[in-house]
Amino acid sequence: MIRGKIDILVVDDDVSHCTILQALLRGWGYNVALAYSGHDALAQVREKVFDLVLCDVRMAEMDGIATLKEIKALNPAIPILIMTAFSSVETAVEALKAGALDYLIKPLDFDRLQETLEKALAHTRETGAELPSASAAQFGMIGSSPAMQHLLNEIAMVAPSDATVLIHGDSGTGKELVARALHACSARSDRPLVTLNCAALNESLLESELFGHEKGAFTGADKRREGRFVEADGGTLFLDEIGDISPLMQVRLLRAIQEREVQRVGSNQTISVDVRLIAATHRDLAEEVSAGRFRQDLYYRLNVVAIEMPSLRQRREDIPLLADHFLRRFAERNRKVVKGFTPQAMDLLIHYDWPGNIRELENAIERAVVLLTGEYISERELPLAIAATPIKTEYSGEIQPLVDVEKEVILAALEKTGGNKTEAARQLGITRKTLLAKLSR
């Protein structure tokens, strides 16, 4: 793994203490960032890579234990050292139980501090817990669920290699985020990452985008253009929705991968390229091969390493963290003070099935923040499809008829729309006639 200097985040609401630590740590060769509150620390961890966090326990608003837990939720691998006054050693023990790697007594013994820092960083390298040169949170990959931890482990293992990767998952699960993390954590990270959505272009435009074209090769080609393969030379090429390309483009892409060279449209000259290829699709390419719609040889070339993206409903325990992440982002963007979600609103978010996955959650939170007039997001600000979600309770042994469940959802939708049957039907994705028929059963 290629690394630069070690980045340390110091979290303490004592500005003078922060300044002293910053000067000391910089003298030891570390890069140092300062956060004067827990909320500031979380904002920085979301945006930047840190190899270690040094956090005080006693802080106003959000104390060190709460900050520790939130940082661990964003990035379970990051080592955190807690600073505490001698009189609060019990709190330090609590911090260790919550995931702190070690604690330091204030006023700090600088020799002990240096020794503890070196041990913490060495421990992280030895255990392999260190995220590579970019943290998951930096790419919006937030969560502590088993499914998310499995995905992050796969990225950490696969990123250093040059193997072609095929990412499969439903729309909105974050396939491009994984591609960006794989590139950023690779030895090619200082070279370009070039992306292309194959489904957005017809065959002729896709060929020109991938391989480039000569001046005059077709109508409108008023100058020569390099393709995405050449632009990505030395770096990574990410092809999204690879399952949507035509049979002819499959042949040309296969040749480029096999020969490691491309040919501009309208040219006989070949150009050697060195790229790592990452492809993504929502389609089952094995099924597409069986159906004769996708070349088997290209499938094998792409499917060297397969990464399966979990849907949001497979990692419901991550929804509160993701919702909070989006809430903070959109509250800041809209210059609003939003303190959080009501318990009822969070229950709805957790129980909704999210067919659009993380992208749908992000859009729902943005809408809620824009519509919000108070301090807490409630079910009133959520889209109707989410607000009408039945909250699943502990199974009582009695099966409720499907017709009753449907009626409950429709009644909730009608309440939400003030009795407007047409609007309720529209937001539920059914016709008004179907809604009336289900109500009359």
From Swiss-Prot:
<feature type="DNA-binding region" description="H-T-H motif">
    <location>
        <begin position="421"/>
        <end position="440"/>
    </location>
</feature>
<dbReference type="Pfam" id="PF00158">
    <property type="entry name" value="Sigma54_activat"/>
</dbReference>
<dbReference type="InterPro" id="IPR009057">
    <property type="entry name" value="Homeodomain-like_sf"/>
</dbReference>
<dbReference type="Pfam" id="PF00072">
    <property type="entry name" value="Response_reg"/>
</dbReference>
<dbReference type="Pfam" id="PF02954">
    <property type="entry name" value="HTH_8"/>
</dbReference>
<feature type="domain" description="Sigma-54 factor interaction">
    <location>
        <begin position="141"/>
        <end position="370"/>
    </location>
</feature>
<dbReference type="GO" id="GO:0000987">
    <property type="term" value="F:cis-regulatory region sequence-specific DNA binding"/>
</dbReference>
<keyword id="KW-0597">Phosphoprotein</keyword>
<dbReference type="InterPro" id="IPR003593">
    <property type="entry name" value="AAA+_ATPase"/>
</dbReference>
<keyword id="KW-0902">Two-component regulatory system</keyword>
<keyword id="KW-0346">Stress response</keyword>
<dbReference type="GO" id="GO:0000160">
    <property type="term" value="P:phosphorelay signal transduction system"/>
</dbReference>
<dbReference type="InterPro" id="IPR027417">
    <property type="entry name" value="P-loop_NTPase"/>
</dbReference>
<keyword id="KW-0238">DNA-binding</keyword>
<protein>
    <recommendedName>
        <fullName>Transcriptional regulatory protein ZraR</fullName>
    </recommendedName>
</protein>
<dbReference type="GO" id="GO:0032993">
    <property type="term" value="C:protein-DNA complex"/>
</dbReference>
<keyword id="KW-0963">Cytoplasm</keyword>
<keyword id="KW-0804">Transcription</keyword>
<dbReference type="InterPro" id="IPR025943">
    <property type="entry name" value="Sigma_54_int_dom_ATP-bd_2"/>
</dbReference>
<dbReference type="InterPro" id="IPR025944">
    <property type="entry name" value="Sigma_54_int_dom_CS"/>
</dbReference>
<dbReference type="GO" id="GO:0005737">
    <property type="term" value="C:cytoplasm"/>
</dbReference>
<dbReference type="GO" id="GO:0045893">
    <property type="term" value="P:positive regulation of DNA-templated transcription"/>
</dbReference>
<comment type="subunit">
    <text>Forms homohexamers in the crystal structure. However, the dimerization interface between DNA-binding domains observed in the crystal structure suggests that dodecamers, rather than hexamers, might be the functionally important oligomer.</text>
</comment>
<dbReference type="InterPro" id="IPR011006">
    <property type="entry name" value="CheY-like_superfamily"/>
</dbReference>
<feature type="modified residue" description="4-aspartylphosphate">
    <location>
        <position position="56"/>
    </location>
</feature>
<feature type="binding site">
    <location>
        <position position="173"/>
    </location>
    <ligand>
        <name>ATP</name>
    </ligand>
</feature>
<keyword id="KW-0805">Transcription regulation</keyword>
<feature type="binding site">
    <location>
        <position position="329"/>
    </location>
    <ligand>
        <name>ATP</name>
    </ligand>
</feature>
<keyword id="KW-0547">Nucleotide-binding</keyword>
<keyword id="KW-0010">Activator</keyword>
<dbReference type="GO" id="GO:0016887">
    <property type="term" value="F:ATP hydrolysis activity"/>
</dbReference>
<feature type="domain" description="Response regulatory">
    <location>
        <begin position="7"/>
        <end position="121"/>
    </location>
</feature>
<feature type="binding site">
    <location>
        <position position="359"/>
    </location>
    <ligand>
        <name>ATP</name>
    </ligand>
</feature>
<dbReference type="GO" id="GO:0005524">
    <property type="term" value="F:ATP binding"/>
</dbReference>
<dbReference type="InterPro" id="IPR002078">
    <property type="entry name" value="Sigma_54_int"/>
</dbReference>
<dbReference type="GO" id="GO:0001216">
    <property type="term" value="F:DNA-binding transcription activator activity"/>
</dbReference>
<dbReference type="InterPro" id="IPR001789">
    <property type="entry name" value="Sig_transdc_resp-reg_receiver"/>
</dbReference>
<comment type="function">
    <text>Part of the Zra signaling pathway, an envelope stress response (ESR) system composed of the periplasmic accessory protein ZraP, the histidine kinase ZraS and the transcriptional regulator ZraR. The ZraPSR system contributes to antibiotic resistance and is important for membrane integrity in the presence of membrane-targeting biocides. ZraR is a member of the two-component regulatory system ZraS/ZraR. When activated by ZraS, acts in conjunction with sigma-54 to regulate the expression of zraP in the presence of high Zn(2+) or Pb(2+) concentrations.</text>
</comment>
<feature type="binding site">
    <location>
        <position position="172"/>
    </location>
    <ligand>
        <name>ATP</name>
    </ligand>
</feature>
<dbReference type="InterPro" id="IPR002197">
    <property type="entry name" value="HTH_Fis"/>
</dbReference>
<dbReference type="InterPro" id="IPR025662">
    <property type="entry name" value="Sigma_54_int_dom_ATP-bd_1"/>
</dbReference>
<keyword id="KW-0067">ATP-binding</keyword>
